[in-house]
Structure formats: C-alpha cells, structure tokens
Amino acid sequence: MSDEIVLKTEDLTKHYGGVHALEGADFELKSGEHVAIMGDNGAGKSTFVRQITGVEQKTRGRIWLYGDEVNFAGPLDAREAGIETVFQTLALADDLDVPDNLFLGREMTKWNWLGPFRLLDYKRMREATVAGLERTAVKIPNIRNTIRNMSGGQRQCVAIARTATFHSRLTIMDEPTAALGVQETAQVENIVRQLKEAGEPLILISHNMRQVMDLVDRIIVFRRGRIVANLDRRETDGQDVVAYITGAKTGADYAGAA
C-alpha cells in the first residue's frame, strides 16, 4: 500500500432543503487501501457515495480523484473516470443476460465487412464473461439467463462480478452482501480479497461487523451526517465501533460529532 491518495474529499456536504444529510465530510483513501464506512441507517453513508459517484450533485465541497479535482455530472462520468460502483439497487438491466449486463456501455465489437458500422462481438463477450466469473469464483449456472430470472443472490453476484471484471481505479460497494445467503456472501468476500491482492482500492459500506473486521484496513464511522471516527482496524474492536455508531463515544477530532 503506497501513500498515493486515490480519493480525497474536503467539506463534502449535501442538504435536501432543511435536511442536512451530509455535513463537512473530509475523507482520504490511499492506493491499495480498503476502507469500510459504517453507521446507522440515515447516518449519511450512502449520501456520501452518491456525491462521489455523481448520482447527486453536492451542496458544497470538493472531490479529488488521483490528484485531479472532479465534479461528475452522473454515474457514467464516474465510471469513465475509473470508479466502479455496486449500488444497493444493483443497476442491472432485467431483460438482458449476464454478458450483456457485464458489458453494458462498453460492448466489444468486431469489424463489419458489409458496411461502415462495427458489429457487437457476442462470442468475445461471452468468453470474457465466463473468464471473469471463473476468476472471481462466482457461480452462475447459465449466463444466457436474463437477470429477471435469477435469484436476488445471483443478481448481486453478477453486479459485483461486473465490478471486479473491469480493473478499476476505485471500487465502491454499497451493502454488497445484504440479504445474501452464506455461500453467496462468501463469494462476495472472496472477490473483495482478490481486489486487495491486486492492490485495487475499495470503499465498502456495510453493517456486518464480522465482515468489516475481516476485510478492511480502516473504518470510518458516520453519525447524523458527519464523520465521527477514523479507526485503524488493527487497533480497534467491534465494541468500540458500535460505541461511535450509537453516540456512546464521540470523536474529539470531529466538530459536531456528538
């Protein structure tokens, strides 16, 4: 893990009218680092991610990606800049199969001898899909099934495999194992470990304390829209994290943290 700053935010803030969903978030993520964001529902975790990825436009603040200040107009801009995100809503196309979902917006093409327009190369996309699923140990019985005909767990695994297939500059996972079974959760956690081994930085939003303690380097705690703690995972425990989440413990370094 190097000292290169992958992502930095300064005074990142989002207001919805009189509701201060996110207030003054200062955050840094280093190259190869895996950071968890924790907090109760409504604490500001997902709001923070939506500002970074361009899903929403911030009220104020600044964002840098690898040293360049960015202001994404939408999620597509963020993805083109190298940010791969697994949202809670998955963002999958129900009527498309697995290869079409993995390559949606970045389809492989081949030369068309009959005209000036290139053709979709379905064979290469299917082969790349199988290779990507094998590499991430995600088991999908039939990749030609549409997403609509898959279980919730299979859908989640497809969304995460899509993220892991394309080596990103930054991966963000928002509750990636929510409502998954034991086996599917293990598959997702295996993907996270593979990203770590590859040196790819990750932001993980999770309520799963066991998972967080097993997978990340550092834990950021949000409470009432503010960052209240920045904890080295090796120097803390679940009880300490919960104390910050509930407000039983406050971060002296963070104004308005109580």
Identify what each model region corresponds to.
Residues 2-258:
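Glycine-rich phosphate-binding loops of nucleotide-dependent enzymes
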